[in-house]
């Protein structure tokens, strides 16, 4: 009887994993979401398409055409933009400029940017604050020494299995399951924060809960709209998937659903040190701090703020 009860409790997530299998580019159709509205004034990159990409890629005495390589790796969109001009733009596997493309883990970088915006807005005081200031429920799990910076740098030491093939891993539970707030506040530690880098999506979902608590009566999506989507004059409507239709939270480790050109504008913002057409959208200090190489003991390959 206990085994049946446990299976019943977990069956929804597991059954979704079995039915849907691995994460898919069409998953945004399966999840509830919050909308992002395009701007009335739309920023558009200029077009000057050139064939200045490598024709052939060579490695280990093998060669493959550039576009065949991209398509073979299941790429959906590939753009090269220089000086606000699109020099190469190609879509694959039936996709086009109008197609919605999921961000997957690019959402982690957006979440990092929004933490920076919240610090600029003095909604969050510092990345050195303990996350228990915003999520006091985690005190009983020993999270008092885990800071926002630890989450940003993936050195929190949370117990979280980042597996893409097991339906029992936390990554599957977070992706396919609901009630992420409960799942997040039930996380445990397996070591001391700040000692070891470990890439796990649970860090970013914790950041999402910190941000939601700091925003109080505003959703993460509405803050994203206010701080980035509208100021960056996005061309298209978009969305951010949530765990539940009612009273849900954004899946901040993944799941922003937008067009390739609009995603590229976030890159343009960082290329210009946080400025957009002369206006400082996010502080230059945050851009520099979040992208510099991290050489601390717990880092790996220079990973900084997601």
Residue ranges of predicted features:
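Penicillin-binding protein/beta-lactamase superfamily catalytic region
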Residues: 185, 195-197, 216-218, 222, ...
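Active-site SXXK
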Residues: 84, 101-127, 151, 207-211, ...
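N-terminal leader/targeting segments and the immediately adjacent pre-domain N-terminus
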Residues: 6-95, 121-124
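Catalytic-site signature segments of enzymes, centered on catalytic residues
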Residues: 98, 165-243
